Swiss-Prot record:
Keyword Coiled coil attached: no
Keyword Glycosyltransferase assigned: no
GO biological process: L-arginine biosynthetic process
GO cellular component, as recorded: cytoplasm
SUPFAM superfamilies to which the protein is assigned, alphabetical: Glyceraldehyde-3-phosphate dehydrogenase-like, C-terminal domain (SSF55347), NAD(P)-binding Rossmann-fold domains (SSF51735)
Name of the protein in question: N-acetyl-gamma-glutamyl-phosphate reductase
Membership in a protein family: Belongs to the NAGSA dehydrogenase family. Type 1 subfamily.
Matches recorded under InterPro entries: AGPR_AS (IPR023013), AGPR_type-1 (IPR000706), NAD(P)-bd_dom_sf (IPR036291), NAGSA_dehydrogenase (IPR050085), Semialdehyde_DH_NAD-bd (IPR000534)
Catalytic activity: N-acetyl-L-glutamate 5-semialdehyde + phosphate + NADP(+) = N-acetyl-L-glutamyl 5-phosphate + NADPH + H(+)
Signal peptide: none
GO MF assignments: N-acetyl-gamma-glutamyl-phosphate reductase activity; NAD binding; NADP+ binding
């Protein structure tokens, strides 16, 4: 630990995303985990909650006190659930800290949309639509000066990355987009639930939250913000019997002027390559992406294929890394002028 390193506080430390943050910071050359909080496990070492950290991280869990944390850390990563997170983010920001929020509390641009989909009263409504969305590939300039960054959702990351450039360029129809996503079980969190028990998930794939998943409005909202055009998206998530990873298969219609579907796909691949040519974490590839190719990394793999009258986009990410904690470390690096990929397995 260097005295000149960035000091990181982890708020809400018992879940998988918190473990992933701690894991990534272990090898970060310019940042150290110095504070970790938990209401239920105060006084315990973080390594007791996450045995993977035994012998490598000796931080003791403490209660959340924003003023105390602000004296010890430069940035807070808030890994609390929606509703509870916004209140803690407010306290930390008012104590003078810069904050990266893992919840959905500040991702959407509309308070009405947030309250409709999440069913809670927002404790800091004046910041809705004001907080920067944490996708450096599109918002790096805003992230550099942000006091709060809304870390993207995992499914939305796998959909926004390929869709936003194509919508912005006018290469696909915007009123008929189908996003079919498969996720590992870690995406459901660490708290025990019937639906994520081994006997329920092993050797089974199941759709869930059909037509009601809260990431659908996030996908539509962010594509419109980036591309400047509204979209209609049908989003269906599935739970798969693997620990981590997301594979999104996205069905789109090329615009009528694009010529053949094959020509349209070539144009899409070319545009995506140009868009992400300088982005270290996003790769437009000729092979079909798979979750195994990006597991444990901050990489995104995207490819496009023709199929009948549609183009089929395939995008793979690790839901815990680029879909959560890796993106947070990437955002932290941008916020504090560190190399963008520092601490990330590249």
């Amino acid at each position: 630990m260097s005295s000149s390193n960035l000091r990181v506080a982890l708020v809400g430390s018992t879940g998988y995303t918190a473990l992933e943050v701690a894991r990534l910071l272990l090898t970060h050359p310019g940042a150290d985990l110095v504070v970790a909080t938990s209401r239920q496990d105060e006084g315990k070492p973080l390594s007791e909650i996450h045995p993977m950290l035994a012998g490598r991280c000796d931080v003791t869990l403490q209660p959340l006190d924003a003023d105390v944390i602000a004296k010890s850390a430069d940035v807070a990563m808030c890994c609390l659930p929606h509703g509870a997170s916004a209140e803690s983010v407010k306290q930390l920001a008012e104590a003078g800290m810069r904050v990266i929020d893992f919840s959905a509390d500040f991702r959407l641009s509309s308070l009405e949309t947030y309250q409709h989909w999440y069913g809670v009263k927002h404790p800091w409504p004046e910041r809705i639509g004001d907080v920067v969305y944490g996708m450096p590939e599109f918002f790096a300039d805003e992230i550099r000066s942000a006091d709060i960054v809304a870390n993207p959702g995992c499914y939305p990351t796998s959909a926004i990355m390929p869709l936003a450039p194509l919508v912005k360029a006018g290469l696909i129809e915007t009123d008929d987009i189908i996003v079919d996503s498969k996720s590992g079980v870690s995406g459901a969190g660490r708290s025990p639930k019937l639906g994520t028990l081994y006997c329920e998930t092993n050797e089974s794939i199941s759709a869930y939250a059909v037509g009601t998943h809260r990431h659908a409005p996030e996908i539509a909202d962010l594509v419109e913000r980036i591309a400047g055009a509204p979209i209609e998206v049908m989003f269906t998530p599935h739970l798969t019997p693997m620990d981590r990873g997301i594979l999104s298969t996205i069905y789109v219609k090329p615009v009528g002027k694009a010529g053949s579907v094959e020509d349209a796909v070539r144009a899409m691949m070319s545009l995506l390559r140009d868009t992400y040519s300088d982005q270290p974490c996003v790769h437009v590839v000729d092979h079909l992406p798979a979750t195994k190719y990006v597991a444990g990394t901050n990489h995104v793999q995207i490819s496009v294929r023709p199929s009948g009258k549609r183009a089929v986009i395939v995008c793979a990410i690790d839901n815990l890394t680029k879909g959560a904690s890796g993106a947070a470390v990437q955002n932290m690096n941008v916020m504090f002028g560190l190399p963008e990929t520092a601490g990330l397995l590249m």
